[in-house]
């Protein structure tokens, strides 16, 4: 009986002691895409993210709101998010962007492609995302031209 309780106690202690549990603010960029995200990491190993994404197409900004959930684990100063699924995707376009979309077929095509891609992630989990905890206590993810930095806020 004691052998079964020990792993449960150890995993509970690890989650409670994890520097990841709490609320984080993340800012990311990848060429013409910018994100501003609030992520809540819970002790049970799950997380919920609420993001605003902006895509700049020569001054015309397409904006979206995305809410997602998934699982997380932290080992060797690396945070891995897995089973990431979007539960909500909505458009946040400005009146200026809406006017541009009414007149631009290329803009309509781009907007449709982006929105369809985001909605597609509601049906199936996305790829794992990995962040490194740096010396300053920030989570950093870099992949080619993409970079995201997260700061713990509480």
Question: What residue spans do the PLM features occupy?
Answer:
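Sec-dependent N-terminal signal peptides
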Residues: 2-14
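Lipid interaction determinants
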Residues: 17-75, 80-154
């Amino acid at each position: 009986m004691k052998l079964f309780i020990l792993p449960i106690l150890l995993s509970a202690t690890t989650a409670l002691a994890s520097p990841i549990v709490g609320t984080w603010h993340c800012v990311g960029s990848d060429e013409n895409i910018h994100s501003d995200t609030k992520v809540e990491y819970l002790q049970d190993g799950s997380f919920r993210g609420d993001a605003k994404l902006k895509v700049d197409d020569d001054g015309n900004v397409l904006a979206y709101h995305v809410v997602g959930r998934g699982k997380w684990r932290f080992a060797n100063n690396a945070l891995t998010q897995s089973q990431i699924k979007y539960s909500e995707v909505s458009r946040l376009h400005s009146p200026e962007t809406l006017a541009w979309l009414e007149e631009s077929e290329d803009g309509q095509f781009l907007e449709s492609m982006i929105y369809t891609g985001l909605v597609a992630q509601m049906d199936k989990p996305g790829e794992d995302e990995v962040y490194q905890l740096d010396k300053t206590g920030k989570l950093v993810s870099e992949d080619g031209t993409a970079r995201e930095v997260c700061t713990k806020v509480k």
